[in-house]
Amino acid sequence: MKQLSEKRKEKFSAKRVAVLGVLLALASAMFIVESLVPPLLPMAPYVKIGLANSVVLLVIILFGAADAFLFVLAKNLLTALAVSFFVLPFNLAGSLCAYLAMAAMYVLLYPKVSLVSVSIAGAIVSNIARTGVAVLLMEAPSLYIQLPFICGLSVLAGIV
């Protein structure tokens, strides 16, 4: 029983909470700065480079997939408060799908695949999810035509 309480204390240690808080602030700031930059594709303003997803990958590596899931939810809530709740469906879909792809690849395939590959997968899945949300909200299936080009950009974004 004593071991369980020690593990719980370690999970909620001041250092751990502080590091996660700093990383949350960093990811949120990166997203906010990225949202101030004009869209890369004027015809697809919902497509983002996804710099904050690199911080999510770091949280997966340092703290594990469970903490990273809560981190993604907190990041989306903070950025929605700071930027706009209008973009929340796009951001939440992109972030959660990128998280799922990166966590699965990291847990199941790393070190057989590189961290760059994990990041690229997260970027591709994020932009596919964002496009899917745009198709649903705008009722415009023709937006899927942009996916090959968007996925190409996602590879570049994942490398960054």
Model-derived regions: residue spans:
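Hydrophobic cores of alpha-helical transmembrane segments in multi-pass inner/ER membrane proteins
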Residues: 55-59, 101, 155-160
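Helix-capping/transition residues at the boundaries of transmembrane alpha-helices
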Residues: 59-60, 106, 110, 134, ...
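Individual transmembrane alpha-helices with interfacial aromatic-anchor signatures
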Residues: 51, 144-160
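Short helix-perturbing small/polar motifs within transmembrane alpha-helices
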Residues: 2-4, 18-24, 29, 71, ...
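Interfacial aromatic-anchored transmembrane helix boundaries in multi-pass membrane proteins
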Residues: 31-49, 73-102, 115, 138-142, ...
